[in-house]
Amino acid sequence: MLSPNDGIARAIITSCKGAGQDIPVVDGLDAETESIKSIWAGEQYSTVHKPTKDLVAKTVEIIAAFQKGEEAPAAEESENNGVIDVPIYALDPIVVTEANAEEIFAEDPDRLALLEG
């Protein structure tokens, strides 16, 4: 089941357990702490991790350009909101599963600790 976020993904799992049903393959979004634990326990199948450090780095790069009186770095794409073309600085989301969680969170001691304990 594709869920719009991790909270609902965990609610699906809880509901299935409560009804005595098998847990289906459940995907979430946001890489919430409880869902990382659930993935590691073999319940939730996956979540989508958004690379926050990359997002912050891109934001700082844009702000630094503005502080220097420069234009924002060129965006690879844009979307018209009905008024203007809004630049899009897309970062690749990362699908996290039990099979790759350790690798994905290897540089994140807080998240890695969730897998160890």
Give residue ranges: language-model regions.
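Hydrophobic alpha-helical
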Residues: M1-S38
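Sec-exported extracytoplasmic/periplasmic mature domains
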Residues: I13-Q21, W40-Q44, E61-K68
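Flexible, solvent-exposed loop/hinge segments that line or gate ligand/substrate-binding clefts
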Residues: A31, K50, V95
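Short, charged, surface-exposed secondary-structure boundary motifs
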Residues: S35-I39, V56-V60
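Short beta-strand elements at the ligand-binding edges of bilobed clamshell
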Residues: A41-K53
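Hinge/cleft segment of the Venus flytrap/periplasmic-binding protein
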Residues: K58-G117
